[in-house]
Design a protein with these regions (language model features):
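A cross-family phosphate/adenosyl-ligand binding-site feature
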Residues: 1-118, 124-213, 217-395
Length: 395
């Protein structure tokens, strides 16, 4: 996801420096070229050799290292960097960067960088909450740095409070949001639905389907990475919530309808990827239904057709896309759905096609519009998500 990107990781002298090694490793696994620059104090907590083994690149500490190629190294590094992140950032380094001090390799390089810059302060709670530190962080924000708020918990000093460096996985999400994709959805509001619904029979049992939510979650993440403000209305899934996405958890088809109806008026693009129940029990038992020797018939009633509602109540300029899971006559049924629902695009797939079933990480999608049919090959759901978004914004 970060192939072709150069990430500059600045490591300063705090106990959380060990987490920077895990961050470097994670970025390398995402195919980024990771350059590391350390303060001398940072080398007291973790050795440059650790980062060199993880990244396959020489670590910079000394501004006047005579072993580097003949060039102004901090300028050369700043020019080829796509993003700089300082993690952990001590109070001292935050102060230096806020006031333009450049007395070592890290601060000198940071001053020369014109790429997106992230900083993750990590320190004792009292130091973090000190008005001087807060003023310095606000200055950094004014100068274009994105400040990643520290986590709360037990600190190395024994105190409990705010000041922990976030976990590497969270830091990676900030980096991905900043540089992983072009921001062609910046300024757009995108509403996604995902997952199954559950229609209760009694306090114990419910009617549901096999949807894992993976496709909808992939679309939500892709839209976020492309700069959109994303709202995800999701049924029950086992998938962690995507970073930087507003998540609305629902259970039943009626709950999904109410959430979608509330969010839809402000959305520029709506993609309904959820597998919503078409029918729900007419009556929900107050207590667990006991089995008997006779057969059981459960009367069902129609749920609200959410996609049709969206098509009938769209605002001007709004793009609406639905999904169609079929087992036969996929194109014919999906074209009919496109017309009947009054939407702009149907993303159709065939449950019987290899790689396109429930719960898998791939999909085979056909994008159907009023005047076009585009057959996508077998792809990862992440790549399918990007293809859907690209087609949608062209409508």
């Amino acid at each position: 996801m970060l192939k072709g990107k150069t990430i500059l990781l600045g490591v300063t002298g705090g106990i959380a420096a060990y987490k920077a090694a895990a961050l470097a490793s994670a970025l390398v696994k995402l195919n980024a070229a990771v350059e590391v620059v350390m303060t001398k104090n940072a080398t007291e907590f973790i050795t440059p050799l650790t980062f060199e083994e993880l990244t396959g690149r020489r670590v910079m500490v000394d501004t006047f290292d005579r072993n580097f190629q003949h060039q102004v190294e901090h300028i050369s590094l700043a020019q080829r960097t796509d993003l700089m992140i300082v993690a952990p950032a001590t109070a001292n380094v935050c102060a230096k960067l806020a006031h333009g001090l450049a007395d070592d390799m890290l601060t000198t390089t940071a001053l020369a960088c014109r790429c997106p810059k992230l900083i993750a302060p990590a320190m004792n709670t009292n130091m973090y909450e000190n008005p001087v530190t807060q003023d310095n962080l606000n200055l950094l924000r004014r100068y274009g740095w994105e400040v990643i708020e520290p986590a709360s918990g037990r600190l190395a000093c024994g105190a409990v409070g705010k000041g922990k460096l976030p976990e590497p996985e969270e830091l990676v999400q900030y980096i991905l949001r900043a540089v992983a994709k072009e921001k062609d959805l910046a300024g757009k509001r995108v509403l996604i639905t995902a997952g199954p619904t559950r229609e209760a029979l009694d306090p114990v049992r419910f009617i549901t389907n096999h949807s894992s939510g993976k496709m909808g979650y992939a679309i939500a993440k892709a839209a976020m990475l492309r700069g959109a403000e994303v709202t995800l209305v999701t049924g029950p899934t086992a998938i962690p919530a995507p970073a930087f996405v507003k998540v609305i958890n629902i259970s039943s088809a009626q709950e999904m309808f109410e959430a979608v109806a509330t969010e839809a008026p402000t959305a520029d693009l709506i993609i309904k990827a959820a597998a919503v129940a078409d029918y729900t029990p007419c009556h929900v038992a107050d207590h667990k239904m006991k089995k008997s020797d006779t057969d059981l018939s459960i009367p069902l009633k129609r749920t609200v057709d959410i996609l049709k509602y969206l098509g009938e109540n769209r605002r001007e300029g709004q793009i609406i896309c639905g999904f169609s899971m079929e087992t036969e006559n996929m194109l014919e049924n999906s074209r009919s759905k496109l017309t009947k629902k009054g939407v702009d695009m149907i993303c159709a797939n065939n449950l019987k096609e290899a790689g396109a079933g429930f719960g898998v990480d791939t999909n085979v999608i056909t994008l159907i519009t009023a005047d076009d049919v585009c057959q996508l090959p077998l792809m990862s759901k992440e790549d399918v998500a990007d293809a859907i978004l690209t087609k949608a914004i062209q409508l």
